[in-house]
Every structure is written in C-alpha cells, then in structure tokens.
C-alpha cells in the first residue's frame, strides 16, 4: 500500500470555555461582573478596581476579564484582606437590595427595540448619540423599576476603533469581540442548549443565537447570526454596526424587527407597548400583524391593535438617518409576507411610501413606522416641530402643526454621567430623596449652599484628571506612530490644566460644523496664545467610514493643531468612546456645540456636561432651545441672518469669537484673592440649579409614560378586551366610511363669510347640509383659516372653527358654526370634512379629508 505524504481529516472544532475558579467568598463577584449595574454604580467600580488596580487598567475596566485573570495568590490575598472583603460584602448587599425590589406593575410594560445600546465601553454595541440615549434609557428603567425589556444586536466587531495617521487621516479598525469575556450570558432553551431563533426571509431562514445583557433589573436580548448554522452571506448580518451595503442593512432590520418579536415570543414575553427607537426596528410591527392575522383577525383588525400599542421615536431630520430600499431588494427578502397578512404586494410596499400608488418611490422604514405606530415623537421641542413638517406629506389633509407628532426631550442618566466628585457633592448637600426626585428643581437649588471654593476645587481636580488622561493617550498614540519625541514633550508641556478648557466632541458629520471655530485662523491664534488668559480647545469624534467630508474635517483640524501657534492649544483626541466622553464632559469648562439649525435633533452631550458644572456655549438648536437660561450659559442668536450657508457660518464664527473675547474669557479670569472667579462659579451654580434638573433620564422616562405609554396601554386594553370587540368595530367602521366616502356630498350651504368676506366684531353663521350616505353622524366639519402673508407653499393655521351638528333627517345632517372675526387682514379659508369617531386616537388615525366648496 502506498503511503501518502499526509492523510488528515477535517477537525470538528467545538467551543470550549474554561472559567477561572473563584474562592467561595468571592463567587458573588461573578454575579456582579455579569450585571451592568456596575457601569453606573461607582462603589461597585471602585470595588473591582481595588482587587488589582494595575490589572483593572490593563483589562480596560472589564470586570469579567479582571476576575478571569486574577492570579491564585491574589485571590487568596483578597480573601484575607478584611477591608476588601468588607467592601465585597457591602457592595453585594447593596446590589441584592436593588435587584430584589419587584417591578412596578401599575405602569405599562414596554418592549424597547434599538439598533445600538451604549451601556459601557466594555460592550461595544454602540456608535454614538442614539446608542448612548438607548443605554441610558435602560439604566433609568432599571432605577425606576419599570417593567421593560429590550432587543438589539450582539455585534462581533461593533463600531470601529479610531486612530489617526501622522497626517491626520482617520484609520478605522474593527476588532472582534470575545463574547465569553463580556458581561453577557447565553440564553438557553428548556433543554439547556443555546436558544436559536429562526427568522424567515423569503426563501430561507436565518438562525440567531440569543444573548442577554443584564442591565440592572432590565433584560436586554441581543441577537447574533455569526454562527455555523448560517451561510457565509448571513453570518455577517450582526458583524458591524451600520456596516456593509444596503442589502445587509435590510437584512439587519428584518432581524431586529421580525427576529426581535420572534425572540420575545419564544421567551414567552408579552408587553403592553412596543417602542421602536428609530425606524430601523419598524418591521417588528410587521411580525406582530402576522401574529394577529394568524390568530384569526383580519388585516385591518390586526392593524388597530398593532397601531394602538406601538410608538415610534424619530431621532434625526437628516436624510441619511432614514433608510430607503428599492422595491426589488425589499421583495427579495420580504416577498412572503403579503400572503401571511392577506393583502397584496402593492399594499405592503405602499405602507412604506408617502404616495402608496407611486411605484417609483422606494420603501422607507420611517414611513412604515409612522403608518404602523399610533404615536410618533421627536426628541426635543424644536425637533418635534421639525418632525411634524418632515412627516406632514403622510397626512395630506392636515397642516404640519395640526398632526399628532409629539416630542419628549432627551435626557441623560445622572449616575452614569455625573463624575464621582460631583456625586459626593450632591450626596452631601442635596435632599436624601434626590435620586428618586431628580426632576425637582427645588432640590437642585441646594447647589447654592455649596461653598464657592469647594466647587472650584472640584472643577480643578477634574480638569487635572482630564489633563493626565490626555497626556497618557497622547503618549501612546505618538509612540504608536513613531512621532518625534521632542515634539511630544513640547505638546504635553503646553497642556495647562489651569487654562480655560473648551470641548467640542461629537460625531463628525458636516452639519455639526466642527470647522466653524477655524473660520478666522488669525483671530483664533490670538485667543489661544494670550499668555495672561490661556485657552485650550479639545476636539474628539469619529466620522463614518463612508463619510469623506466628515473625515476631511478631522484631517483639517488635526493639521491645524500641528501648526506651531496651535500646538498644545488645539488638541484632537482619538477614538471618542464612553470612557473618554466621561472625562471630557466633566473635565472641560465650556461645552461647545455649533450645528446648522435645525439639524441637531437633541444633542445630549451638553446635558451630560451640565451634571458636572460644565457650562454650555451653543447654537439654539436641539435641547438647548429649551435649556438655555440667561446667566447660566451662552447661546448664539436663534434667528438665521443669511440664506447662504457660507455667510451664516462666517457670522456665527464671529459671534463665537466675540463671546469668547468679550464675555467668557474675561469672566473666567476675573479672579479673587483666593485665585478663582466668583462670577464664573455663579454661572456654574445657575447652570446646575436651573438647567440640569430638567434634563435627567428620570424626567425623560416619566415623560414617555405620561405622554404615551400609559395612555396607549389603556386604549389597547379597551381594544383587545372581549375578543377584540372594539378593534373589530373600529376596523369595520373605517371600512364602511372608506367605501362611502366619495359619495358623501354637500346638499346645500350658506357660506356668505368666506364667499363675500366680513368685518371684525360682527357675527356670521355658516351652515352646511351633508348627505352622509347612511352613516350615523360619522363626519365633522370645521372652517380652517390660514394667514395670507406667507410666501410659496408655507402655511400657518390662524384659526380652526368647528361646526356643530344641529339636526338631521334621514341621511341629511345640518351643521352650523358662528364666527366672529377679531382681526382684520387677508386670509385664506376652506371648510374641511373629516371622519368622526370618539374611539379614534387622533385625526391621523384615519386620515380621510374632503375640502368642501
């Protein structure tokens, strides 16, 4: 027999996990490490740090890895250390007391869907503001003890790690996460095997493992397709956040929405409200519709239940934030759903179009979300108005200010973002019930009782911590790039912790105008090089790898920072993440934000700064429109002076320079004999006492319950009880009205006011007789009056005068309205007829409108 050169079969590798054994006295630490409660409890973080401070820094503050890598000798030493063991006992007792409180069942239960969650820099499943907001929301849901769960993705590579080349070019690196080293756990089925959720695409299934991140009392379920059950084309679905092409994005959104609902079903979880945090998750409603139809309801009946229990939060007016898919691509993966729903393909695709009959229009997830969610909200008061205008084409019979799009202004999770030094001050001077009543401004007024020098010392301590951290980061990056050591030393020496420090740190999208400060380089050079009043600017942020313009901004700022007059005065910090963000929002003196108004939907980094005595300098956009108080920060004028954006940029830059030169810098350096500025501390105290209490995540969560969750849950309950009787009745009523709508007509009218005009102070009666085609008082009428002084297609509703039904005979209903004009001028008016039913959530719930002659 001939002997081959080699003869080897293919090994069948199996996953093998070997865990480090903890002594019995320390086993509670494993439970602590696997619950992200430690991410916002500073005593828990201090405990892990005390186990081995050097190792804690090496493992980048990951307690799971820390416990795995503790040496046997160190574990034995910890057990014998009475001080550490007391800390272990105390922190674990605090944790168990927190966890053992039963959830508040009086409030609506919620399932929360989002593409990203920023919980800790250890768990890289976030990229920016949306994820930070979602992570903070789950933490506050836990603290407030509400009944909530969440669904997202466990990304193999997450978002990219950023570094800069020697010439300032952004380098994006995707590092694989080792799931066994993260504060998460596999979800197992009833047989103890990893749970698998099978998600249907048109002709096949994608198989997702399910993991759970324990966020205090809240369970966050994370889907993972990177497994051997899937093809090479589907394993990457959960590889990268916002990575891949549009086909992969669609596959992600199918997995999040449809797969998310299937996951909850498999876990036996039902909630009152389903909250789509951005349009990425909108397809969760498609699966819910399928479930109701499979249970015996018609499509229209199912839609009543799904809409009533769904909320869509939109986070941006920027077009790039709204996903559109070609019909061909959408059909490739969603072709089987019309049959499941009992509708046509055109009807399904039409739910994602502003004009359902326009076959050239792409399917938009945001539009689908609006059409399948009863309520829609923006994330600040201004953004709510912008969203009303943006979505107005969906409800053509109503003007933007009339539609139902609301708002809840974003907040931030106080325990996560308030530095430990500030937590000590708040604990010392504030009411003991502070954490349960964070939105109470009266409690925050206690900041005025804190001695000025204590606040100044706290601010200086945090500034020095920031400078030390920056020096470490800079040394690492310059060594990595083999930079000139002499230049590194020169730069580090120029970073003066006593200087006025200004931070501009956020995602580098062009509308955020990171370039604004560099409009007049010579003027900026004078500002930063004043020897008596030094000023430092810190920039940090990532640009999407596909955003060439954003990367160009980073390169430009980096190049300017390397010029001799700006070296050590303008500093760009690589790899903006949660850890760096916490340092910056507590360490600088001024937080600067310069977006193009009104493109900043909310912007929460400035709110985080408020919790740390850092004062805002910002365009009046996003949350700052509501937050700004005179004497508690600075704002650029709200009014836009120039339509030409370049001219507006120059004006805004000049305004910033002027505020710095004439107001901010002189105020900061107006020092007393003790070496600090009393006037500056006054601004800090005003900022904390009058602004901070209104921008906590506690207030945001309460707003969602008060404005949406509780009301929707109550309505859903009414629709669903008695075998969905009311849902069926409303669906039938809508179908009947829709069938007869075109036939409903005016029999007679008396409209002398709108036909001939009128005079102020005089009363006019208008009447209409309407043939309702057998419907029983099913329509309403109102006179809509517009101001006639606006150009183009802009409209402003001046007044709406409702008609009252006075009498009816058979199908004929008589409506009348008495109107007394109170202002002279030119107006436009028309009578609007609409379907009327007390069981509708709002007018846009059934958006049939007929304008009458």
Q: Whereabouts are the PLM-identified features?
A:
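Catalytic cores of carbohydrate-active enzymes across secretory and cytosolic contexts
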Residues: 1-853
């Amino acid at each position: 027999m001939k002997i081959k050169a080699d003869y080897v079969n293919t090994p069948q590798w199996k996953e093998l996990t070997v865990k480090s054994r903890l002594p019995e006295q320390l086993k509670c630490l494993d439970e602590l490490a696997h619950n992200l409660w430690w991410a916002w409890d500073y005593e828990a973080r201090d405990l892990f740090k005390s186990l081995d401070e050097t190792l804690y820094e090496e493992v980048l503050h990951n307690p799971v890895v820390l416990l795995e890598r503790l040496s046997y000798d160190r574990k034995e030493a910890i057990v014998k250390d009475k001080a550490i063991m007391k800390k272990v006992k105390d922190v674990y007792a605090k944790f168990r007391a927190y966890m053992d409180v039963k959830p508040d069942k009086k409030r609506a239960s919620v399932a929360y869907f989002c593409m990203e969650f920023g919980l800790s820099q250890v768990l890289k499943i976030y990229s920016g503001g949306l994820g930070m907001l979602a992570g903070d929301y789950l933490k506050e849901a836990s603290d407030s003890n509400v009944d909530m769960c969440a669904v997202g993705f466990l990304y193999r590579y997450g978002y990219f790690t950023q570094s800069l080349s020697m010439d300032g070019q952004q380098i994006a690196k995707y590092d694989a996460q080792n799931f066994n080293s993260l504060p998460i756990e596999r979800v197992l089925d009833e047989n103890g095997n990893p749970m698998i959720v099978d998600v249907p695409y048109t002709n096949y299934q994608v198989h997702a493992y399910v993991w759970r991140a324990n966020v205090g009392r809240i369970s966050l379920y994370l889907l993972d397709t990177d497994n051997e059950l899937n093809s090479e084309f589907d394993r990457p679905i959960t590889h990268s956040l916002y990575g891949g092409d549009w086909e992969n994005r669609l596959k992600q959104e199918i997995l999040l929405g449809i797969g998310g609902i299937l996951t909850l079903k498999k876990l036996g979880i039902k909630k009152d409200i389903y909250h789509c945090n951005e349009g990425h998750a909108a397809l969760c409603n498609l699966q819910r519709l399928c479930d109701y139809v499979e249970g015996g309801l018609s499509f229209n009946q199912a839609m009543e239940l799904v809409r009533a229990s769904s909320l869509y939060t939109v986070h941006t007016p920027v077009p790039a934030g709204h996903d559109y898919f070609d019909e061909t691509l959408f059909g490739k993966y969603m072709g089987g759903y019309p049959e499941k729903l009992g509708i046509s393909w055109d009807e399904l695709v039409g739910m994602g179009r502003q004009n359902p009959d326009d076959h050239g229009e792409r399917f938009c997830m945001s539009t689908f979300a609006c059409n399948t969610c009863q309520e829609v909200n923006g994330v600040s008061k201004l953004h709510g108005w912008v969203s009303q205008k943006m979505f107005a084409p969906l409800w053509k019979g109503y003007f933007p200010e009339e539609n139902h799009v609301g708002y809840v202004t974003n907040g931030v999770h106080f325990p996560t973002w308030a530095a430990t030094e500030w937590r000590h001050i708040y604990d010392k001077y504030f009411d003991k019930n502070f954490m349960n009543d964070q939105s109470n401004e009266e409690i925050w007024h206690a900041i005025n009782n804190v001695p000025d020098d204590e606040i100044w010392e706290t601010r200086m301590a945090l500034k020095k911590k920031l400078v030390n951290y920056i020096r470490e980061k800079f040394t690492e990056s310059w060594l990595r790039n083999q930079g000139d050591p002499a230049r590194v030393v020169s730069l580090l020496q120029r970073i003066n912790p006593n200087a006025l420090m200004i931070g501009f740190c956020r995602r580098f999208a062009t509308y955020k105008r990171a370039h604004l400060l560099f409009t007049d380089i010579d003027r900026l050079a004078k500002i930063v090089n004043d020897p008596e009043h030094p000023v430092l600017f810190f920039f940090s942020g990532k640009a999407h790898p596909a955003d060439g313009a954003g990367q160009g901004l980073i390169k430009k700022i980096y190049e300017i920072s390397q010029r001799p007059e700006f070296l050590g005065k303008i500093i760009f910090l690589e790899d903006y993440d949660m850890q760096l963000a916490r340092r910056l929002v507590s360490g600088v003196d001024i937080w600067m934000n310069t977006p193009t108004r009104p493109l900043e939907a909310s912007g929460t980094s400035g709110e985080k700064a408020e919790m740390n005595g850092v004062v805002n300098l910002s365009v009046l956009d996003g949350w700052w429109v509501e937050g700004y108080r005179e004497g508690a920060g600075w704002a650029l004028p709200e009014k836009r002076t120039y339509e030409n954006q370049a001219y507006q940029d120059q004006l805004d830059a000049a305004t910033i320079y002027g505020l710095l030169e004439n107001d901010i810098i002189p105020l900061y350096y107006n020092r007393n004999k003790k070496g600090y500025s009393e006037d500056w501390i006054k601004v800090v105290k005003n900022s904390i006492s009058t602004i901070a209490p209104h921008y906590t995540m506690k207030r945001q969560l309460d707003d969602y319950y008060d404005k949406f969750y509780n009301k929707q849950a109550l309505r859903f309950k009414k629709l669903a009880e008695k075998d969905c009787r009311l849902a069926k009745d409303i669906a039938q009523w809508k179908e009947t009205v829709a069938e007869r709508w075109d036939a409903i007509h005016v029999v007679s009218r008396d409209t002398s006011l709108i036909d001939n005009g009128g005079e102020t102070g005089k009363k006019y009666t208008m009447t209409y007789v309407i043939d309702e085609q057998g419907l029983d008082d099913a329509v309403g009428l109102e006179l809509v009056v517009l101001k006639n002084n606006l150009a183009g297609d802009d409209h402003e509703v001046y007044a709406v005068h409702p008609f009252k039904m006075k009498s009816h005979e058979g199908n004929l209903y008589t409506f009348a309205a008495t109107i007394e004009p109170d202002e002279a001028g030119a107006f436009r008016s028309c009578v609007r007829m609409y379907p009327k039913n007390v069981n509708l959530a709002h007018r846009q719930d059934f958006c049939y409108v007929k304008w009458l002659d």
